[in-house]
Amino acid sequence: MMLLGFTMLPALSKWDIRGWGETNALNGPTWSLMWEYLANILYALFIRHFSKTMLGIFVAFSAFLTLNLALNLDVFGLFSTRSYAIYTVIGGWSTTPDQLCIGISRLLYPFFAGLLLSRINKLIKVKAGFWWCSLLVAALLVAPHFGTGDTAWINGAYDAFCILLMFPLIVSMGAGSSVTGRSVKVCKFFGEISYPLYITHYPLIYMQVAWASHHKDLPLGTHIC
């Protein structure tokens, strides 16, 4: 299991430890890095040769996959058992057909949209771009889950709106802006530390979950501390 984690290769479902269906039970977030590594391999071999037109076609198709997932259109008939996460983009960390579809859907649009933005080089230049981008990200992420029952689709529409429109806009603004002074060192530090933190934080969560399950009767303040 540890060797598979080192290589980002998915583990067999029968090796699952907690019943969460993770591709690697020792470090859950490796599922997303597995998809990223696969995308980078395909880019090195084939995708880097795509024309702008071809990239545009893939962006359109991957946008459809995003809508299919977020709005639960279920064109491929894979999401019938996904009631727990309906009208969200949650999932992608297992090797079952539905989870593979979710993982691919979550990967492709950001990947191809980013490539197309880079290729056409149409960046948005704004003053204080760092702060505007930070404000937009914060505003989008603090929004609660929208809708329940018959209106649950609103949450899926919001997720699709963020993924298909707002996030590319923020990336374009960020790439077209620059920082100066002390902000350069701050941004550089957080940019360099974000990836290592992402791949190392989840084992700490596993330990916290295990500790909490064995100390359920302790006061809430103890769990928070």
Regions found by a protein language model. Give the residues of each.
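Alpha-helical transmembrane segments in multi-pass integral membrane proteins
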Residues: 15-20, 46-50, 90-225
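Small-polar-interrupted transmembrane alpha-helices in polytopic inner-membrane proteins
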Residues: 54-74, 133-141
